[in-house]
Structure formats: C-alpha cells, structure tokens
Amino acid sequence: DKMLTDPVRSVSRIYRDTRGNRSKIKYRENMWLMLRRYKKEYPSAPFFYFEFYPNSFGYGLAFWTWKQSAFKEVHNLIIEHPGRWLDAVDACKQAGLTYNARDNYKKDMYPDAPKEIKPYLSAKNMEFSYSSFDMNRINSPSLIDELKLAFDLARPMYSFWADAYDNMLDKGIIKPEDAIR
C-alpha cells in the first residue's frame, strides 16, 4: 500500500546531469521505470525496476542504501531468519532473477555465520536482476505478463527487504529528512 506508481516520479529523465562529468553527453543511454515507496518519505527503500538500453533490457528488484552501515540491518535480519532469507532467494531464482552485489566488504564481517548465508553477508547493497539482448521482446505484450509474474514471484524478497528497511527507519538509521540534499 506504500508503493508509488505515479509515472511522473517513477520514470528516469532523458537528460543526463553533466555537472562534474567530463564527457558532457547530454542524453542518457539508458532509461528506467522504478516501482518504489515515495522517495521523500522513504529514502533508499527497496524497489522493483525495468530498464532498457539501445541493445538490451532488464528488470529486477534492488536495495541500495547510501549509508553502507545501514545495510547491516539487512545482514542482521538474514542472520535472525536464515530460512526466510533462503526461501526469498529461491523465490527470486524461480522468477529468473540472478543475485548481484555491486559492492562487498573485503573482510568477513560474520565469521560464525552459516555457510549457506555467508555469500550475502558481505554485500553493501544487493539486487536480483534479469537481462536480455533480445530487443524483439521489448515490443511484445507478453513482456508485461512476464514482468508481473517475475515481480509477483519475487515478492518474498521485497517483503524481507521492506522489513529490514522498516527496522532502519524505526531505529533512526535512515531518516526521511536525510533524503533532502
């Protein structure tokens, strides 16, 4: 019930911010649509997305925080509920989504953690994603059904991350006023 689907606030801009960018290319190469909680009230909340490039497209579920320390709340929830976490990971696999972490801690932060959850405990952010280079599919109505099914199957992961995110808000780790920069 907190998901924002207003296209004015959920779709990327075509113009690129060229400040501090040497290339000064005016337009983006990729475009995206995000389905997420309202950014000003829920900064850094997990989200579903669909994106496309000139030669590929993809979709998935992601959770990135601008405070790396905030992501430890996700790790804590994984440790507290490893069965629920692994069920959510399996749900994402069933949806055809692949796990990826853009940044990881080099040091083992949880040396006593069970082996099956260890790969996820070094992540500073996470996503489960799908990519395709078959651009003929992008104009197909069946892609919408595919997205709906994948996002529905991945719902346990979104719920898991939303619980971790709500813990961050409750503990004051992430504050809505921090989003206004």
Q: Where would I find each of the regions flagged by the language model?
A:
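Charge-dense, helix-prone N-terminal extensions
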Residues: 1-181
